[in-house]
């Protein structure tokens, strides 16, 4: 059976999508129905899922996360498939959206104001391209036999100009600005490092949280019995898995 390693943040882990993956570390939010598990089932792959909620590119490459070693340590060179969904936490993308949905009084807190500050987001975005390039380069070196596929983020906002209550138009516009830069940086890193790309964002433009058939969850309080706000739901994970399967085996 071919070995498949899944790397990434909560957008790949699937926090709140039941059931949890057996043996998942505390705080990882790793679902047994995330896209990696679904792809492995469809293609009969031997899955090693090290996705972890809150992960940054540094957690993929060099830094521990809670009890987990850097995700790249899961690669042993025998992999035939590696998927990567990462980068949003480097630039505060989902925290920005969650913060924008908070009451006005809470948004005055310094840490929240910083997340909603355009200059601060631009500063964070300035280093994203290099960080994603480093991930692609390192994974290709560690897994030379593998097809390495970057999977970008599902769409989390309606089209620019469309109401996204409780987010203000200003905060929704900032969210789109970060989302577009994240998509662009992911695509550029994939091209530059010889990796492939699955464009989950483009495929989900009509399946944002405010749509009739959402693939992601919108604003709300994080509750343990449902998917985390501004993250994929079960339908979204199924859709991303299908995109990956189609990329690997178009027939």
Per-region residue spans from a language model:
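Short amphipathic alpha-helices and their capping/turn segments at secondary-structure boundaries
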Residues: 1-5, 64-83, 132-145, 245, ...
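Catalytic nucleophile-elbow at a beta strand-turn-alpha helix junction centered on a G-D-S/GDSL motif
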Residues: 2-26, 91
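Structural recognition of the beta-strand scaffold that forms the well-ordered cores
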Residues: 5-6, 48-51, 80-85, 147-151, ...
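Short, flexible, mixed-charge acidic loops at enzyme active sites
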Residues: 17-20, 95-110, 162-165, 209-221
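A structural motif corresponding to the C-terminal end of an alpha-helix
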Residues: 38-46, 130-149, 181-199
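Catalytic His-Asp segment of secreted/periplasmic serine-dependent ester chemistry enzymes
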Residues: 154-251
